[in-house]
Amino acid sequence: MDRVYEIPEEPNVVPIASLEDVIRGPNPRFTFPFSILFSTFLYCGEAASALYMVRIYRKNNETFWMTYTFSFFMFSSIMVQLTLIFVHRDLAKDRPLSLFMHLILLGPVIRCLEAMIKYLTLWKKEGQEEPYVSLTRKKMLIDGQEVLIEWEVGHSIRTLAMHRNAYKRMSQIQAFLGSVPQLTYQLYVTLISAEVPLGRAVLMFFSLISVTYGATLCNMLAIQIKYDDYKIRLGPVEVLCITIWRTLEITSRLMILVLFSATLKLKAVPFLVLNFLIILFEPWVKFWRSGAQMPNNIEKNFSRVGTLVVLISVTILYAGINFSCWSAMQLKLADRDLVDKGQNWGHMGLHYSVRLVENVIMVLVFKYFGVKVLLNYSHSLMAIQLIIAYLISIGFMLLFFQYLHPLRSLFTHNVVDYLHCICCRRHHRERVENSETSCEPDTRQSIV
């Protein structure tokens, strides 16, 4: 992951204990925006491979497969264009070229060129002071102590940072509203057709990379949103742990969904739709039960209709993420930030418990009712491998939150404390039940 600007690991001043005092940090350094190039590459690669498969399906008169492949591509592409326009606020600006590129679904390409031009401009002017700067304050943990650091951020660096943030949100939209259904459907087609042409393999590869990248960004954005006052860094070990966790979680979940759908075919549709609708309406049910008012300050130029459209879009994205993996945050529609900034161990535990039960049920359905989908491969072995892969992903998730989270020292309770609390409650309940049963004979004897 790239950082558009960063500050050194340790400020070149003596740390102080009081947060009321401010350490003046050095001028930020800008780095090459690799993530913008990578997101654009994923978008173009998935779009090109999807259109190629649409052409192949049309040539082979496979209208049903062609329709779904094209629909998933178009929906995610349109949502990507709207996301970039919304983040950059282009509707209030006179930028006909950018709007035209978005109209022909090439908005990420022109935005990537703009970001590269901005980077080259900064590179040529390196060492020169910008006339327009703003002050940014963030907390940092240095030797276990919170230190408030202030530094100047130039207008050009802030513009490049806005491009980076826009592409992060674009990658999430593409991953969970386009790549997840595309990957699931292409896996299903491969399963029932018993062949893997090169074009479909390339499309599934791009979709899998996009989903894994989007899920990894979910964790990073969740940490940034929950700890907005802190300057956060994720090292290579932390990013590797998140990537392994998300890859195992998503691949095992999607494979189980595909095998379940291939087993029951149309009978699986009501279960999957009901599952998605429960996730979709859960935040709205909590919002209505709380009796809170709809937030009217998400964007200062938004009407109530515009705010409602944003809330619905965010809810659809939230449901799409939670359908395939954990969203790393809990949606809270009554809040201006739209997320619950608490740690929410209970929400995380509930999600993985429910998903584990669902996966086991779907795997059992495939094992006992499924047809022979893969030659020379045991259904029992396949079912065990998928469940083990999902359990390993949960293990990497617990490892990250227990030992690798960048701000784990701020947790009031960690994973071990939560598990210990559950075990203590269960042990205490068993002791109470045993004491009650042991007292019953003594009571009866005293009565006699």
UniProtKB/Swiss-Prot annotation:
It is found in: Membrane. It is a multi-pass membrane protein. GO terms for cellular component: plasma membrane. Its main location: membrane. InterPro entries: XK-rel (IPR018629), XK-related_adapter (IPR051773). The chain crosses the membrane at residues 34-54, 67-87, 97-117, 173-193, 203-223, 268-288, 305-325, 356-376, 381-401. It comes from the Eukaryota. Keywords: Membrane, Transmembrane, Transmembrane helix. PANTHER family: MEMBRANE TRANSPORT PROTEIN XK FAMILY MEMBER (PTHR14297), XK-RELATED PROTEIN 2 (PTHR14297:SF4). Belongs to the XK family. This is XK-related protein 2.
